[in-house]
Amino acid sequence: MENINPSKDVLLHLVNLLQNKKYNEAIAQTKKLLITFKRSFYLYNFLGLVYANRSNFEKAITYYKKSIELNNVYPDVYNNLGLTYSLLGNIKLAKSNFEKAISLNINFTLAYTNLAKLFYLEMDYSRSFICLHKSLLINPNYLESMILFKNLLCLDLIFHKNDTFFYSVIINLITKFNIVQPRKISLSVANLLKKDPSINKLLNLNDINKTDPLRTLKILNQNILLIEFIKICPLSDNDFENLLKSIRKQIIFFNFGVSEYNEVKNFIIALSEQCFLNEYVYDVSLEEKNKISEIEKKIINNIYKDKANIGIDLTKLSLYKNLSNSILLSKIDKNIFNDFIKKIQLEFLLEKNLKKEIPKLSITKNPTSNLVKKQYEENPYPRWSKPAFTIEPLSVENFFRKIDVKLPKLNYKLFESPEILIAGCGTGQHSLNTSTTFKDSNVTAIDLSLNSLAYAKRKCLEFKINNINFIQSDLLNLELLNKKFDIIESVGVIHHMKDPLDGLKILVKILNDGGLIELGLYSELGRRNILKFRKDHMQNKKNYSIENLKFNRKIIKDSDNSDIKTIIKYNDFHTLSEFRDMIFHVQEHNFNIPRIIELLDHVGLTFCGFSNLSKHILKKADINSDGFNKFSLSNWGKIEKDYPDIFSGMYQFWCQK
């Protein structure tokens, strides 16, 4: 029987040429092979792929159609044709070809994912989710599917049923893939967990304290998604906060036998990790405080017949206190510590040593800077566990072509190995993301807080990031670096300075001509409910104690005012340092569009576009209508008045010098 396609080795050689972008060679060799293999549908499909990679889409379509003439049941060519039509903007033909590919191969993961992407781009999220579900059922480890899945989760996806299949997919996403900050999918995860009938029942109980604690803990110990998620991320949901707080109280008062504890310890230790991550933000009753003191005395005096009970009591304490530097640990055999306590103790010691290695640019003399520094030394911001890395670093050119900004002047050759400054890096989450976003980049990250920098440095070691140089410095002293940068990112920073203009002037001075700067500034309209709370309801405004922070959280939780109640929906409400940063910051400015225009004009920066407005948000505000110039900052004032929540996080945008 005649072979219509070349041998496997020959085909692999052609694929290798394509992967190495040797397009001319690939075309020449394929056309030569077609002299012998005239009816090779594979070779015609391959030629289409090569031309598509060269952006010659018309030729690509011609060769794909020739392949179909030779074999109209070859699913790959329909998928490739669909991709080409989607690049040309012909969504109708793209969909029909993906659907044809699926009809020929019902297990075609890539075609399902490509179809899901089209629905996602059209903001038809329910259909996108259906296609993606099918793709993930076939291959739950397919990266493209996981990226789209996390994008859908970031939209606060509402699950309509208790589909436990997604438990394993989300666990896979947050444990094996570093492509999403878990905090961004927290609401979607909470929504899915609420569909579990047993958890839903617990959430709706009038008084959980009347239930059998051990039975409740066994129910929670069986939910692997709940356990895995609360180990790595604060669960930003008020219903779950109330539930977990009540269960914590049950745990500290329950007299566990060793075997009983072992049955439910996975959940209890996970709850300890949750409390550590949210910085023990839950209220503590007087009776709980008394019980904590009782357990501490018991440990100090070593009143135990069985060593296992020491470990149980230590775990109970870790639900209420950060034990990483506790004197109690010196009283106990280290073999008794659970893995979580061992981990936070090691992390504390590592950060202590890292502080000695972080260079200091200068002594901070500015009074406001010192107040801000004190806040972040007390409450390093934010505490996080998992980063969101870019899968494949991009050149500066490709990055700015990918995001929706308009750059008036840019010589990309000057940015081949970009020098990047993160001005106000905090605990490093943003810095790590940036360091993996830009190809061949060198990142300098500065912050006032040494505790925050040590946290950031530890995270770099954990995730093997080696292109970031951390320095302790006041932004006002950055000229002492004697260095200029191609890109500066300063998100959520200069609005915490006494005069934001002074800070921006410094940043512009050390930015190269034609360089780019990303700024993030609070919106007075977007944060109107926070400002209203401060003005009308906040108690003891200059008292930054844990007790007062919790007292004011309770005012918000118990408020009958619907505007004030919306503050609970902020992620920042659900951890102590973030709540302090949001409500009790020692220095804060809130902006509006006219004030930003004035600020940028003063330093000669050109507005290039917002970086934190997804198509989902733009659709809500009907921004994509014809005639609206989104690159004119003055146009956004009216938009924000009509849609006051559009910048509820902050204004985040790129400018050019």
Language-model segments: residues:
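Conserved class I S-adenosyl-L-methionine
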Residues: 516-565
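Rossmann-like AdoMet/SAM-dependent catalytic core
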Residues: 552, 558-657
